[in-house]
Amino acid sequence: MLSMSGPYTRLGAVLSALIVVFSIIGITMHRDFYAGRGRREFFCFYTNVSNLAVLLYFALAAQRLYTAESLHHLIPHAEFAVMMCIMLTHCVFHLILYPAVRSAVRDMPRTAAYRIVCTDNFIIHYLVPLSVLIYWLLCSPDKQALSPPDALYWTALPLLYAVLIFIRARFKGIIEEAGSPYPYPFLDISVFGAKRVLFICTRLYVLCVFAGLSIIAALHILK
């Protein structure tokens, strides 16, 4: 697992191990629950993409970054990007999608499927993001190395995801789980129109950059 240096050696190792375990459980539960529905569409959802990014970083990339001294300078930038990407998942779900999900789940019979849905949603939308946030706050080193461009760099993943989703919607058709060519209602051009969706995406992007800049500014003010 992760080789840590500095004052949070043991805590960092424990948290990184827990994050890997939580990510594996969340992704596995999600895939298994929908296994009979053709999971080629699994990564049409940003939630799954961001949880996979967390898993790949803490299970594979972090080990390389922390053990190769020549790569140490990349750690604060990589860990900030991973934290912001997964916190975007948490914020969009909690602030935008949760009311509709809660309404749908409330009417489900209290079966094993219901428990899986509730547990999985909690893991991938809350437990993993907040665990990564705690790790970043307590264990991620050299946060003072972050600068305003980092507020843009981390958005590469959600931007790439958005571009690929709109391309997919044009050529691939309906996502079975969503009942639409678009994975999330606020991206549905057929419902809101291209101008409205562009406005929503632009506003969300500006908020993402502003959040990144605010965090970086706070770090430098509090140093």
PLM features per residue range, with description:
Residues 1-223:
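Aromatic-rich, lipid-facing transmembrane alpha helices and their immediate juxtamembrane interface loops
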